[in-house]
Amino acid sequence: MRPRLIALPLLLSLAAAAPHRPAAPAAAADGAGNRMAAFPPMSLPRPGDRPDPFVMHCSAEHWCARMAQDQTGRGWSIGVGHGAGMPMRADIEEGDEESEFAIWPHIVIEAGGAVLVGVEARRSTGYAGGGASGTRLILYRAEAGGGALHPVLDLPIGAAKDIRACFDSADRRHRLGACSDQYEFDGMLTLDPATRTGRPHFIYAARARTYPGRRSTDSDSTTAPPLRRSDLRWWTDPGCTYSRRFAFDPRENGYVPDRPLPACTDYLDF
């Protein structure tokens, strides 16, 4: 049986005993000395097994984090520890239908010693002939000397929908065999290399697309004109393919974008 609760002394000892690893080749840094590095799991799942949400993740700098559940099996939390220091813990505010959680496989190490550790929260739903899923990233900030662990950024990093569009042979002919409307959204968070002082700034790049051709959840595919061969391609949605710069705002006690994010409900709402 997998452990669902992790005691603070256990997290403390695992953090202190974490093996030293070289920095990941993909690590990035900005001009202020903030870095993004790999935050891998201490053990990998066997082939064919699902990833264990309770596995410990540790960095080369001896920062470690692990997910835990309460005794009811419903409430989730994250514990973060550094070396022999006192571990920190924060409850995760779960969204509707979120049932899968995992540690983000990257860690941001600030020049001043604090770190940002992420949790990926996933929700999904199924319906006749299709389904939808979405993942958001929640970043938590931890000080090297201990103290409160609190969320500072919450962003969508992935979403997908597959909606049935064929219900008989006529539909299959009209759709040229493309019998589902597909929606994809991907978001990536990286350090802003232009940052010269202070806390890290981030670049968030989002890309959204639909298939076949331009699709919208506001329209009924069964009443749309027949597809053409030229429609059998992915269409990049310019309204939901964008970039934003996030900076820390002390008044909000979190990161805010330089411009509002579009809603992109076709991809993110279900």
Annotate each PLM feature.
Residues 20-50, 57, 134, 142-270:
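Acidic, small-residue rich beta-repeat scaffolds with periodic aromatic anchors
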Residues 122-135, 183:
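His-enriched metal-coordination microenvironments in redox/metal-binding proteins
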Residues 10-18:
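Hydrophobic h-region of N-terminal signal peptides that target proteins for export
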Residues 66-70, 126-132, 232-238:
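Short consensus segments that form the blades of beta-propeller domains
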